[in-house]
Swiss-Prot record:
<dbReference type="GO" id="GO:0051537">
    <property type="term" value="F:2 iron, 2 sulfur cluster binding"/>
</dbReference>
<protein>
    <recommendedName>
        <fullName>Na(+)-translocating NADH-quinone reductase subunit F</fullName>
        <ecNumber>7.2.1.1</ecNumber>
    </recommendedName>
</protein>
<dbReference type="InterPro" id="IPR010205">
    <property type="entry name" value="NqrF"/>
</dbReference>
<keyword id="KW-0915">Sodium</keyword>
<keyword id="KW-0001">2Fe-2S</keyword>
<dbReference type="GO" id="GO:0046872">
    <property type="term" value="F:metal ion binding"/>
</dbReference>
<feature type="domain" description="2Fe-2S ferredoxin-type">
    <location>
        <begin position="36"/>
        <end position="130"/>
    </location>
</feature>
<comment type="subunit">
    <text>Composed of six subunits; NqrA, NqrB, NqrC, NqrD, NqrE and NqrF.</text>
</comment>
<keyword id="KW-1278">Translocase</keyword>
<comment type="similarity">
    <text>Belongs to the NqrF family.</text>
</comment>
<dbReference type="InterPro" id="IPR036010">
    <property type="entry name" value="2Fe-2S_ferredoxin-like_sf"/>
</dbReference>
<dbReference type="InterPro" id="IPR001433">
    <property type="entry name" value="OxRdtase_FAD/NAD-bd"/>
</dbReference>
<keyword id="KW-0479">Metal-binding</keyword>
<dbReference type="InterPro" id="IPR017938">
    <property type="entry name" value="Riboflavin_synthase-like_b-brl"/>
</dbReference>
<dbReference type="GO" id="GO:0005886">
    <property type="term" value="C:plasma membrane"/>
</dbReference>
<keyword id="KW-0830">Ubiquinone</keyword>
<keyword id="KW-0813">Transport</keyword>
Length: 411
């Protein structure tokens, strides 16, 4: 047999082997890899069903069809907000979901939409209010410091549009990949002391992917055409100076008037109860946002006559904001009072008001002698340590869970 024949047979054999392997791979792919279009039935309503290619996560699949499920962490599985009920399909619940979903909920079909792989036809159940959620490209009106580490971001909604939110609600804000240099931040001189002390100007935030985060609104429904946020910059803690700074807060702090920003919403469950009970608002830091929204809504839109008070904790006098607004509301509404407590007042503050942590101030100066603290409704938003201290104090007073309403987004 000539060398040329042997070579030809070798090539032919090799080709056959390659073709067989390709066939095996294609067969395996057809069985194991998602392909083709699938249908997701929603709320047993044929008109709400969506059809799309298999292979994505449920959160992204719904978003691609204009159905936006809340996800403060942007689909990372850490916030636990994107809970939906999967009635059919979706596979087994994953370990990453079990920190947010208990055994009873898992048995009933509740899942994190960001963790569910869409491999075949599915049936899901979504809250009806989700179908009112939309996206808007907004324009930055202003982005000004209200405290050392808090900016007020004011956004203009596109002309002719409106975000039909309720006081206490929140929106999600999006950002594309970007690089932010802290040295480029526009921060008034009066707030430079801590920035210089900790050399915060040295930080750089580099983000390589699309991100989404949730922020409570400081605006209230009657402030038409705008969305207002209070955003605290998430700098690395002093004991971990090499940790990366907060991605979204860094991005928001870099925004300037005229910049475009994509938001979606409205979302929320931190809403005021429709009762005649006394309302006690407790806030700290950027937790001011939903407090402002609620109090303005109660007094300026609803003209509520319910007895209400607002207790706000700040470090020093320069960390107090919206003071003139709340002073005016107090002067105009005999049913409303507000108090500030400074935890670290400066000598130059010449502060004669309350001092200490806000939960202690609230207890010592009001609730300790209140005839029925368990009958009040408590609305709070602030740093986790504040929230925990307030909740413990209220529990010790006999306040039931149903009268303790917490917004986790402030801090």
């Amino acid at each position: 047999m000539s060398d040329s024949v042997i070579l030809a047979l070798g090539i032919a054999a090799f080709t056959v082997i390659v073709l067989v392997l390709v066939a095996i791979i294609l067969f395996a792919k057809s069985k194991l890899v998602d392909s083709g279009d699938i249908t997701i039935g929603i709320n047993d309503d044929p008109e709400k069903a969506i059809t799309l290619p298999a292979g994505s996560k449920l959160l992204g699949a719904l978003a691609s069809k204009g159905i936006f499920v809340s996800s403060a962490c942007g689909g990372g599985g850490s916030c636990g907000q994107c809970i939906v009920k999967v009635k059919n399909g979706g596979g087994e619940i994953l370990p990453t979901e079990l920190s947010h979903i208990n055994k009873r909920e898992a048995k009933e079909g509740y899942r994190l939409a960001c963790q569910v792989n869409v491999k075949g036809n599915m049936e899901v159940e979504l809250p009806e209010e989700i179908f009112g959620v939309k996206k808007w490209e907004c324009t930055v009106i202003s982005n000004d410091n209200k405290a050392t580490f808090i900016k007020e971001l004011k956004l203009a909604i596109p002309e002719g549009e409106e975000v039909p939110f309720r006081a206490g609600g929140y929106i999600q804000i999006e950002a594309e990949p970007h690089v932010v240099n802290y040295k480029d931040f526009d921060i008034p001189e009066e707030y430079h002391e801590d920035w210089d002390k900790y050399d915060l100007w040295r930080y750089v935030s580099k983000v390589d992917e699309h991100i989404i985060r949730a922020y409570s609104m400081a605006s209230y429904p009657e402030e038409k055409g705008i969305i207002m946020l209070n955003v605290r910059i998430a700098t690395p803690p002093p004991r971990q100076p090499d940790a990366p700074p907060g991605q979204m807060s860094s991005y928001i702090w870099s925004l300037k008037a005229g910049d475009k920003v994509t938001i979606s919403g409205p979302f929320g469950e931190f809403f005021a109860k429709e009762t005649d009970a006394e309302m006690v608002f407790i806030g700290g830091g950027a937790g001011m946002a939903p407090m402002r929204s609620h109090i303005f809504d109660q007094l300026k839109r609803l003209h509520s006559k319910r007895k209400m008070s607002f207790w706000y904790g700040a470090r020093s006098k320069r960390e107090i904001f919206y003071q003139e607004d709340f002073d005016q509301l107090q002067a105009e509404n005999p049913n409303f009072v507000w108090h500030v407590a400074l935890s670290d007042a400066l000598p130059e503050d010449n502060w004669t008001g309350y001092t200490g942590f806000i939960h202690n101030v609230l207890y010592e100066n009001y609730l300790k002698n209140h005839e029925a603290p368990e009958d009040c409704e408590y609305y709070m938003c602030g740093p986790p340590v504040m929230n925990a201290a307030v909740i413990k104090m209220l529990k010790d007073l006999g306040v039931e869970d149903e009268n303790i309403l917490l917004d986790d987004f402030g801090g």
